């Protein structure tokens, strides 16, 4: 029987501990069992004393004492009475719960000081405190309410705090969930305040990063208990920021909490990615020693889940308990309890074995080893190492020390000059080569597959020792030998860098500039020689770069004698993108493609990548594997060799030997044949940033180059002092100059059209560079850097001096490549282009037309005057071919005509002022000389040109329009406008070139003065262009400013002007002989240009206002043609060619005038013509187009027959007539002229005679005043019709395409009719003799019209200038508004498109997830349905069997037996009963008889008595 303590003993123990600091009575009290009926009486001060004692001990942090006090109060709580009332109720009213809150806060401070360390005493103290709290909680409802209101927030805050130990948080959650489980109904309002809601939201966030599954379950359980299921649906979106997590949380049901919580937490932990701290894997089976642990018995629990908790460093899972109801039992394996673990694969299962430090007991099972079987596909190794650490892994062996082997090296040279680097300890290097050759057969098999670096160096060393081949004179494990063939010595990097042993290098680790991995492929040539193997590792790997580098710094012997005739796998070293990104656009690389290469370039049998560096094959001798050299992964400085640091070579002989400039045959052949081509492609790449490159690799069957997209930039490290060969240097420099990142082996068809530098020129630069560097490289070590710097500066100078035209044409090439060019003539074009390269023999340095200040240009400032150095005579023809853009130079003009519109439309985007412009589809884009312009579609094939060489003055046959139009292109001409200060020579001089007459050769004669040669045209073109410059300085400045070209010095202009003026009288004498060509010839004169042959004064009516503009254009063109550097055809160039109608020398002859002639001479010309052929400048409107509006108007009127009013010479209008009426009119005028007296003719009559002559075939000879009259008529006509230009321009757009066929039909009809309508009106040469006083009459008319012409010329200049400005303003505003509106719409559409694409991606991802879920659910449903059907079948079978056995067969037999036995028994019983009844009846009868007899005897005796 327990000893009953004194009722005052508890308070006395508290007093002793508080006053005397004596805790022994309190400890003794703990050892005594207190009966329930014992009452411990305490005073009212008991709570104060208890609070003082606990607070003092908490301040002292005496954990054990506090635990003893809490345990004592907990045990005696129900027996305490204060003033006759229950002690706890009284203390609750006195504020026990509030005092416990202060205890909890002080305890929390102790907890936080311990951090995450596990202190058993602190955990016991907290557990005791919570036990006492639960006792108080169960006293009454008031205690519940106070505890809930006071402790729930503090417990939630403890759970949220990540500084608190996980075990304490788990204990607090358990107690809180117990409280919430027994919460009274009226206490739910306590959990609805804002503080609790905020804490619940924080607890929801805590689930994501808590790192312990049990704690996650406790938090989820607390959240579910603190809210009702309906309210949980609303608050879930506040607790979890992601909707799908909130939706998953809402699916948790209270009745199935365990399984639903498992699904929810697996989802949450799975989506965390790198933040994931709880890894859950399904386990196949689990054993504790020899006992198997069973999965909890829950139908909805699909797998036996094992949780790896990285936050709490525990492994936890749930098993079925041993009790009857098989409750869930949690098993937790802390990291400190595990002594060792191992992971191995057994029978296609992955086994995790945990060896524990002590024997543990789970339920009723004991063991020291925990065996967990997983599926072999699960990756649990890394997670297990993170959980338990790598030191406890069974296969982990700690490295004790580090051994360093240092080896000296001899550098030997064999007979062929090859270097043999041999360790000193190796006795026979030559003999050992045989061993290496034998090893190659085995090594080649392994080199074909990419290798992965090993996880640890110990494994590598172990494998190396296993794979080692033992030979009598084998070198050490850490030594390596190598042979550098003489043929490769200067193309490979310095051999010193390749002689690496296992000794750690003190040099700085090479910078990693790799963005993605490339598989390395070893290629073996026919002779069995292996070449370089490059193994690139991902930068994202978690491996140690130093260890990898140490592992890779091993070399092996290589026989490389047969290298000359075999292709080596080029090491593709791409330069760093950022080095030149500020100067040029950088190309991005698309996925590699492997089309045929030889169809584009025939001499690419040994194509090389730019900056290729063949590295001698490095293979390990002591292990049968190959490793990537650290030299394969390094960076290149932007200066190519500017910051090379010194590295001492092992041998002075080797150091000097590597400086010699020796090139083997194969190196010279491969590099020289491909360097120009590579640089051409590089230049093309920088000029075409719009289009991405496509990579083509040669020998696709042997190579497996994997080039990643966009950011695959492997860089080149120029080795420290010896560096690489001269060829490699120049290739690097050239490729850097053109700013290419990755050079294609074979560019695509588009890129092949954009070469801007000829092969010959590039090879001449390379050769000159070689010759300059050879003596420098032969100097001593001290002069190497000087020579390198000089060669670099020379290359940079050559690059910037010769590539100005590349910069100026960069903008022009982008839209040109975009046009829809036909691919048919590509091969033919390549041949032509290569032929032009062979013609180019001179390198001339001339600045481009663009005055751009290049900060890297060492020889030119944008403000300097250009210096023109002309080469040999053949330069002008060849440089144009070499410089022209391949995408614009066409072999067939027909292909060009089909894409004129698209080409010109794209050109607009480059110009400084964008305008919508129409071009004639008959114009010629570019032709540089007579032989290069193909206008075969304008004339019939093989038509002979018949010239009129006679001096006959009365020739009346008109010239063929078609033949003339062809000569406009075939033989250029020029137009000259002389200065106005010459009194009587102020008229246009038109130099007529070769002309083609009608096909009726019998009626034509040749004129020996009508001669034109290409050789004589260039000089006169220069001279006259400068005359035009003096006459129109302001217009010329406008032209040149917009075209971004530079003027020639004034001295040169004056020289040309003087020469042109001297040659003027001779030209004037020739004019009279060409007057007979008539008005039709005058139509062609608008497109004529200056030549050294005879000229004509015949001027088309629509010529006047074109010439000045055309002359400025001609000057602009001449300036360009003088440039010795190739200049690709620019958009301004093409557009000017459309506007030039007064040029003959210029190869950019427009067909405008030719078409106008055909239309004017057509029978249908009486109707208003659609000005389809009127050209409008596509370039900047302020360029050259001072008379663009008048040009349209002029072209319209010159293409129709006219009648002139004789009332005023200043107001003459054209009225269309039919050819017949025109001929009648001319005839009447002719008759009137003959009938009238010569002196009675007034000036107005004479004017009418001159101006009423038919436009198609009137040929009149006479003095040169006729040109002035005709010009004046044109100006008056234009002045009277200033507003028709806009209508003309609108009609151009409508009839641009449809007029080409009509033009040909009109031309054919006109050819037939003009021969019939030959003008009968003519004025003989001796008209002055027939008309007396004609000289005076002529002078009066001439002076009169001269004055009127000057006045009208000024008026028209002012008008055209104002009209041009107005048109420019409107067109600029229209273009800006249209472009801005289009850009806005495009931006809006792009934003909408991107948004919709994002939505589509999200929807597709949702559909994929849904599909995956459906698939999973379907599989589960099918599996369960199969199991269900199987069980149903088993059930039916069992029932049937039971039924058959129980009812049908056995029951009948049994019942029959029972019936038989029962009947037998019944019969026996009935017989017995019958016998019994009969016996009783017999006995009763006998008794009655006896009684009767007795009574009878008694009566007888009585009677007797």
Swiss-Prot record:
Which residue intervals make up region (Disordered)?
439-483, 536-571, 745-764, 949-974, 1035-1080, 1199-1239
Q: Which cysteines are joined by disulfide bonds?
A: none
Q: Keywords of this protein's UniProt record, alphabetized? A: Cell cycle, Cell division, Chromosome, Coiled coil, DNA-binding, Meiosis, Nucleus, Phosphoprotein
Biased composition range(s): Basic and acidic residues: 1222-1234
Which residue intervals are annotated with compositional bias (Low complexity) in the record?
1200-1209
Expression across tissues: Detected in spermatocytes and testis (at protein level). Spermatocytes and oocytes. Meiotic prophase cells.
Q: Which spans does this entry mark as compositional bias, Basic residues?
A: 748-758, 953-962
What post-translational modification does the entry describe?
Phosphorylated.
| Residues bearing PTM Phosphothreonine | 471, 503, 613, 638, 922, 1174, 1318
Which residues fall in a coiled-coil region? 1384-1435
Indicate where the modification Phosphoserine is found in the sequence: 457, 465, 494, 507, 516, 525, 534, 651, 655, 746, 920, 1121, 1123, 1130, 1146, 1150, 1162, 1165, 1170, 1188, 1218, 1221, 1237, 1280, 1283
Location relative to the cell? Nucleus; Chromosome
Q: Which SUPFAM superfamilies match?
A: ARM repeat
Q: Which InterPro entries match?
A: ARM-type_fold (IPR016024), SYCP2-like (IPR024835), SYCP2_ARLD (IPR041322), SYCP2_SLD (IPR040560)
Signal sequence interval, chain numbering = none
Q: Name one GO biological process term.
A: female meiotic nuclear division
One molecular function GO term is: DNA binding
GO cellular component terms, alphabetically, are: condensed chromosome, centromeric region; lateral element; synaptonemal complex
Please give the subunit comment from the record: Component of the lateral elements of synaptonemal complexes. Interacts with TEX11. Heterodimer with SYCP3. Interacts with SYCP3, SMC1A and SMC3.
The family annotation for this protein states:
Belongs to the SYCP2 family.
User: What the protein does?
Assistant: Major component of the axial/lateral elements of synaptonemal complexes (SCS) during meiotic prophase. Plays a role in the assembly of synaptonemal complexes. Required for normal meiotic chromosome synapsis during oocyte and spermatocyte development and for normal male and female fertility. Required for insertion of SYCP3 into synaptonemal complexes. May be involved in the organization of chromatin by temporarily binding to DNA scaffold attachment regions. Requires SYCP3, but not SYCP1, in order to be incorporated into the axial/lateral elements.
**Identification of the protein by name:** Synaptonemal complex protein 2
What is the source species?
Rattus norvegicus
